[in-house]
A protein has these predicted regions:
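Non-cytosolic coordination micro-motifs
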Residues: 28-72, 108-190
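Bacterial N-terminal signal peptides that target proteins for export
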Residues: 2-13
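Mid-chain, structured segments of secreted extracytoplasmic proteins
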Residues: 73-116
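Bacterial N-terminal signal peptides
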Residues: 13-22
Length: 190
């Protein structure tokens, strides 16, 4: 039988207090862990889903970019798509914004590797959003149902609206399947 001494009572009391403290801290950490699954759809004042006029205004106001207005906007021959390409200052070398039906669905920022290294950016993302869903030496990807963020080597960060992007992929598959069918019909005529 264990003899209960004042030391034993202090040890038992300390153990119980430590146990309660550890579990109360863990309970407080739980919301932060669930927040890691929410990926940002925004960098500074630039966000997925914003319209072209708001994008141009935000780029003009942001000191990280050297936006030259409409000279940096190109219309793409693809359905209602346009591309905004601009240079950056210091940390950002170049930035690309692809719009469909007037809304941004891809933002890509090529960072200056003389100032910022891949490892630091990767660690920041991992600390904030957890481990990537996909990882290889060339790309790290974090994903939710709505958003995909990738860090690509040497150092480009891409934000993609997955809903719009998947619609484009599905449409291109339909176009391609129609072309395949017409091709086969043509070949069958011989």
């Amino acid at each position: 039988m264990i003899k209960k001494t004042p030391f034993f009572n202090k040890f038992l009391g300390f153990s119980i207090l430590l146990f309660i403290l550890v579990f109360s801290v863990r309970a407080q950490e739980t919301p932060e862990q669930t927040d890691q699954t929410v990926l940002p759809r925004k960098f500074r004042q630039l966000s997925l889903g914003m319209n072209l006029d708001d994008l141009k205004e935000a780029l003009i106001k942001d000191d990280y970019f050297h936006f030259r207005g409409d000279r940096d906007v190109s219309l793409l021959p693809i359905r209602e798509q346009s591309l905004v390409e601009t240079t950056g200052s210091s940390f950002i070398k170049r930035a690309f914004f692809q719009l469909r039906d007037g809304s941004v669905f891809i933002m890509a920022f090529t960072l200056n590797t003389e100032i910022i290294d891949h490892y630091s950016v990767f660690n920041q993302f991992s600390d904030k959003y957890g481990e990537p869903a996909y990882l290889d030496p060339k790309i790290s990807v974090w994903e939710t149902d709505e958003t995909r963020i990738s860090i690509e080597r040497p150092l480009t960060i891409k934000y993609i609206d997955k809903t719009v992007f998947n619609d484009i992929i599905n449409e291109s598959g339909l176009i391609e399947s129609g072309q395949v069918q017409r091709r086969q019909e043509f070949i069958n005529e011989f």
